């Protein structure tokens, strides 16, 4: 997949393309720097995909793109091969007519996003100067709705917590101890139930300390979208 993507980038007219080896899957890098004095846009995407299981639920082979009712069905059509291909086709539309792109373009496509981008950080550190750009476009987010152009400028983050519960160290007869001795499974359920209030707000102390509050302008713009937002 990495080799195919690199070949496709060369085919559409990107002059500098290479596969950069990592301890895992290679990173595809390409650049077109023919717009002297113009800003540089760095595109990021990934060519790896989620597993296809369960196969029996697929109506068509997952790695053979199929069009049904005007929709493309294939593994990666929405995450992230479809978005990557869209940007490449936009570049091709200009370059194939002999036109210059209005901005300089750099493209980074990795093959390990679905497993945590384990080698991307080291690649970025090693290639910091090479990756210098005026703006970064992450080609890995969904459309909001049909006919609604979207610029996704943030995603939800995540955090990890470990909860350790210690119960009895030996088996206890349920007829003698059931209900009298705390069951760690039920205690854990109670703990989890208390982590959020009825409105969904997290009750863990300090959870929101570094979370930026939505601005009034953002709320105004969100309310224009065709969905409800509290």
Regions inferred by a protein language model and the residue ranges of each:
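N-terminal helical capping/dimerization or prosegment-like subdomains
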Residues: 1-55
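Histidine/acidic-residue-rich, glycine-tolerant segments that coordinate divalent metal ions
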Residues: 99-183
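Acidic-enriched catalytic cores of C-N bond-cleaving enzymes acting on peptides and small amides
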Residues: 144, 153, 174-230
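Short, small-residue-rich loop/turn micro-motifs
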Residues: 34, 45-47, 67, 159, ...
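Active-site metal-coordination/substrate-binding segment of hydrolases
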Residues: 38-109
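Active-site-proximal alpha-helical scaffold in enzymes
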Residues: 81-99, 117-125, 182-194
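Generic secondary-structure signature for well-ordered alpha-helical cores
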Residues: 10-11, 96-99, 128-129, 168-170, ...
